[in-house]
């Protein structure tokens, strides 16, 4: 019964068309988004002046990426999203929203500059 519900929820999620973009690139960014999940990683490419304010979730239990000490060689790495493969069996409905699901996904990244430019 649970598996049937999961399959029905996944089928409905695939049939519905997205209404709006789920992220917006930073204004004046010098980096281009690659792949469907590039918006999730766009903070790696932004300059401190163009970053959005911290969300309350970050303040509670995690350390924001910009406060971490990173070597210059790590900061200058090219990072691009090569592919995103969602795991529909891991999807769970969010309690505070009627049509929102949280799913796990495999995200394939590349740190090689040549691969990022060819994508």
Swiss-Prot record:
May be involved in the regulation of feeding, neuroendocrine system, memory and learning. May be involved in the afferent pain pathway. Its main location: secreted. Keywords: Cleavage on pair of basic residues, Neuropeptide, Secreted, Signal. Residues 1-21 form the signal peptide. InterPro entries: Neuropept_B_pre, Neuropept_BW_pre. Residues 53-119 form a propeptide. GO terms for molecular function: cullin family protein binding; G protein-coupled receptor binding; ubiquitin-ubiquitin ligase activity. Transmembrane segments: none annotated. Pfam families: NPBW (PF15180). It is found in: Secreted. Detected in a variety of tissues. High levels are found in the lymphoid organs, central nervous system, mammary gland and uterus. GO terms for cellular component: anaphase-promoting complex; extracellular region; nucleolus; nucleoplasm. Belongs to the neuropeptide B/W family. This is Neuropeptide B. One of its GO terms (biological process) is protein K11-linked ubiquitination. It comes from Rattus norvegicus (Rat).
């Amino acid at each position: 019964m649970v598996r049937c519900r999961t399959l029905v929820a996944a089928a409905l999620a695939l049939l519905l068309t997205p209404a709006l973009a789920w992220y917006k690139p930073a204004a004046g960014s010098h980096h281009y988004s690659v792949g469907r999940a590039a918006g999730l990683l766009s903070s790696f490419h932004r300059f401190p002046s163009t970053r959005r304010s911290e969300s309350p979730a970050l303040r509670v239990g995690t350390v924001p990426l910009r406060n971490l000490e990173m070597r210059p060689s790590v900061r200058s790495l090219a990072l691009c999203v090569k592919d995103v493969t969602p795991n529909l069996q891991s999807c769970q409905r969010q309690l505070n929203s009627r049509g929102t699901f949280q799913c796990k996904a495999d995200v394939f990244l590349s740190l090689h500059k040549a691969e990022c430019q060819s994508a």
